[in-house]
């Protein structure tokens, strides 16, 4: 069955909450793909053998990941393009020209769409400016972040995604800096012509990684008023502390009660930097059932998982969404 445009679908179904997939990069790592490189989870797509050999091991792994998230209940899924800015790709892979770069993005989107089918929604994932210098978890964009040309950085990926009708939504993920947020919100329909969302990289204390409060973020949006791009569809939090995420989302909801929100936190596991392994967190306070219930009461329309969330987590999220909607 052909899918309705996403905004129309959610408008026609005001109580519907869509289940997002989970942490693709860490899930591919769990399945044996070595993602520890500057282009992160995009790495399997760089090899020509991924495209020329349908029986290649990495191709099978990526297809199985998508399939497992679908079987777990995901209704909206992402392209594996978080670290796929033109700058990152051209500086760290054999792909150099814009033509080669656009071919890579088109291939990834086509492959993702074929994996999930025509009835599910597909997000074109775009990581933050800070991802190419590993600053998405600090928000430290240097002494003069207001002078960074964010548009030139995002332009190649954004222009490609704008033109691709196989995408339903563009997702700016893990945005940690207020100047980057302001830049994205300043772009009109000539720059961002497809529905989009912004996922904020938020400290466990409830502020943007650069220290900006949720109230200050809300004021930026309120000040834009009717100048804001009508394609701005959702605001939310991602790659955030599992325990603190419900309170953070609620603070956004209180500040912007009419804004459609989304949430996809990390699993709650803790990374041991010495042993370089993920460990269960004895301080994990809540279950997915509890967290999802709180997200829904705070206006979330899309709920999923980020780092270390697996198909099992998405299955639990899906069950909770069905229970509370």
Swiss-Prot record:
PROSITE patterns: HCY. Residues 6-321 form the Hcy-binding domain. InterPro entries: HCY_dom, HCY_dom_sf. Its EC number is 2.1.1.10. Its main location: cytoplasm. It is found in: Cytoplasm; Nucleus. Present with 60300 molecules/cell in log phase SD medium. One of its GO terms (molecular function) is S-adenosylmethionine-homocysteine S-methyltransferase activity. GO terms for cellular component: cytoplasm; nucleus. It comes from Saccharomyces cerevisiae (strain ATCC 204508 / S288c) (Baker's yeast). Keywords: Amino-acid biosynthesis, Cytoplasm, Metal-binding, Methionine biosynthesis, Methyltransferase, Nucleus, Phosphoprotein, S-adenosyl-L-methionine, Transferase, Zinc. It catalyses: S-methyl-L-methionine + L-homocysteine = 2 L-methionine + H(+). Homocysteine S-methyltransferase involved in the conversion of S-adenosylmethionine (AdoMet) to methionine to control the methionine/AdoMet ratio. Also converts S-methylmethionine (SMM) to methionine. This is Homocysteine S-methyltransferase 2. Induction: Up-regulated in response to high extracellular methionine. The modification Phosphothreonine is found at residue 138. The lineage of its organism: Eukaryota, Fungi, Dikarya, Ascomycota, Saccharomycotina. GO terms for biological process: homocysteine metabolic process; L-methionine salvage from S-adenosylmethionine; methylation; S-adenosylmethionine cycle. Gene3D superfamilies: Homocysteine-binding-like domain (3.20.20.330). Zn(2+) binds at residues 239, 306-307. Coiled coil: none annotated.
